[in-house]
Amino acid sequence: MFTEISVNDIKDFQLGHASNKEAGTGVTVIYFPDGATAGCDISGGGPASRETPLTMPMTADNPVNAIVLSGGSAYGLAASDGVMTCLEEHNIGYDTGAALVPLVCQSCIFDLGYGSSKVRPDSAMGYEACMQALKKAGITDSDTCASDNTEPVQGCIGAGTGATVGKIMGMKQAEKSGLGIYSVKAGTFTMTAIVVVNALGDIFDHETGEKLAGLKSADRTEYISCEDALYQFMAPRDMFTGNTTIGAIITNAAFNKAELNKIASMARNAYARCINPVGTMADGDTIYAASTAKRGDSEAVHVDINFAGTLAAKAMSMAIKNAVMNSKISDEEFLSMIK
């Protein structure tokens, strides 16, 4: 019914990354050359986000220009300042009559326990990632960023640079994760899932049930169950910090904001299939859903919302798998980066 394709084959959006490998943090910008209608689902108890009300059905129906994913927890929200500056410099944004205001949504992961907690995504890093996305879109030929047409790197890049999983017993028993991408096509219909996996829980293959990454034993020689570890803490305690899985579903099919909110919530099923435990008060789990279909286009792609939502969950499940499988590093390297 549908086939996997390279995200490079899709021109309705472009990705830009900025990564600080030494500090263990970064930014990913999803830029929409023609804007996008967007929805959002927030299921975690501790989200760090910016301008998510733009995705709500009761707010003005203006297309967003970019979605930003980053590290840095709430500090990382500063990255959108640089994204807005970059877009404004290229005359991209909502025309208020007095000025152009780029419409940018953002969500962050908590990666302050990996690398340096004093170095967080800032305006300059957001600007760099946005410039890379604009260069891929052919809007700028600036040499201030590196960009080519090769397959985008997955794993420890952009917002996934400092992502980790299986942290219920602390970082010494956790494991590296990162950013994953999965794109599919059915006729003229396309869908892409992008995710940064930074979960409290373990990560599983949604098809086989195999544990792919997560909580390890104290000597790091074997995996142990994060769910079983959680059950040791029946009494309330403030110990579960440093998590959040954030992502986006992007399609060229035409949907309104209410429908995209539903698609985002259906895509959340991927988190339940692949992550356990998930959606805790220590997670800020968020999924955006965006449609790049042009408003009023008589030739826009139309598909059933149930088809789109179900496929979104499958694509997100595959992206989660790609995120952890492309982020494997040695125990020695991992332990050198944690507090």
Positions of the model-derived regions?
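Alpha/propeptide regions of enzymes that mature by internal proteolysis
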Residues: M1-K339
